[in-house]
C-alpha cells in the first residue's frame, strides 16, 4: 500500500506531536517552565451511526456496556487529544501542563457528543543541577 506525501507529512506531524510531554499536573519533573504559550485545545463532535443507535437501543433494553458507543467515545477523545497537541506545536510549545478532558451531549436527541481536551502550552527546558 502506497501513501501520498500528505499522508506521510500528517503521520510525521502526529508522531512528532505525540512525543510532546503532556501532564495533568502543572509541572514536569526534571524540567522548568521557561515560557507560557497559552491555552490549547482540541474539540471533536461525534454522533453515533444508525447501526450504533440501534445496538445502543437494544443494550438499553437488556443492559450492559454499549461497545460501539465506548469505541466512538474513545476515538473522539484520541482525536481531541491529537488536535490539542497539534495546536500546541503550531504555537511553538514543547509541552502541555494541566491537561483535562471535558465532554457534553450536544444536539438534543441526536446522541452527538462533544469532547474537549485542553491544557496550557508551555516551553520547558531541563533543570540544570
Where are these regions (language model features)?
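Short, solvent-exposed loop/turn elements at beta->coil junctions and helix N-caps
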Residues: 25-28, 102-106
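Short, ordered loop/turn segments at secondary-structure junctions
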Residues: 101-102, 126
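Short, well-ordered alpha-helical segments
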Residues: 40, 45, 53-100
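N-terminal presequence-like segments and the immediate start of the first folded domain
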Residues: 1-52, 94, 111-129
Amino acid at each position: 500500500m502506497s501513501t501520498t506525501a500528505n499522508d506521510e507529512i500528517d503521520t510525521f506531524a502526529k508522531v512528532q506531536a505525540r512525543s510532546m510531554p503532556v501532564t495533568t499536573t502543572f509541572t514536569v519533573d526534571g524540567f522548568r517552565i521557561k515560557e507560557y504559550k497559552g491555552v490549547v485545545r482540541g474539540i471533536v463532535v461525534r454522533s453515533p451511526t444508525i447501526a450504533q443507535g440501534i445496538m445502543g437501543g437494544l443494550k438499553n433494553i437488556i443492559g450492559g456496556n454499549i461497545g460501539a458507543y465506548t469505541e466512538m467515545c474513545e476515538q473522539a477523545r484520541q482525536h481531541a487529544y491529537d488536535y490539542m497537541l497539534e495546536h500546541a506545536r503550531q504555537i511553538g510549545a514543547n509541552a502541555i501542563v494541566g491537561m483535562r478532558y471535558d465532554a457534553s451531549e450536544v444536539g438534543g436527541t441526536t446522541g452527538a457528543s462533544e469532547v474537549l481536551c485542553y491544557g496550557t502550552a508551555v516551553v520547558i527546558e531541563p533543570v540544570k543541577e
